[in-house]
Amino acid sequence: MRLRSTLAAVTLAAAATVAVVLPGSPALAASCPDNGWSILDGRTGQFFNGNSVNIRTGPSTACVAVGQGQASHQVMLDCYKSGENGTWSHLYDFTTGKQGWSKDSLLVGAGANKHC
């Protein structure tokens, strides 16, 4: 009985100390710039110029990374916009099913050719 009470107390203490920021929460929204986009380019191919290229919720490193692209992945480029330290393209990674923003300097041919 004492062991069960101790485990319950430890579990409650651990749960109380964990801070979670959920997508769409004010804290996350405040740090991530405008992320609106449209399918304007539509080109598909292998556009990551390396491996482990972050795919983010917006055009900034302050935005959450939802996945990583690899050079072998097939993607569709949607459009680009100015963001943190240059331009970023919105894309869909067919290999992983993830979509989001990647910095154009990490994409073959500087990313999408249509502005959002």
Predicted features and spans:
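Secretory targeting and sorting signals
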Residues: M1-A29
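SH3-family beta-barrel domains
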Residues: S5, A27-T57, G69-A71, A112-C116
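A broad, structure-centric signal for solvent-exposed, well-ordered loop/edge residues
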Residues: A8, A14, A62, H73-M76, ...
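Short, exposed beta-strand "edge-strand" segments with a Pro/Gly-rich flavor and a Y/T-containing core
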Residues: A19, W37-L40, T95-S102
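Short loop/turn segments at connectors of secondary-structure elements within structured domains
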Residues: P23, N49, E84-N85
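Short alpha-helix capping/helix-loop boundary micro-motifs
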Residues: G58-A65
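SH3/SH3-like beta-barrel superfamily modules
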Residues: Q68-G109
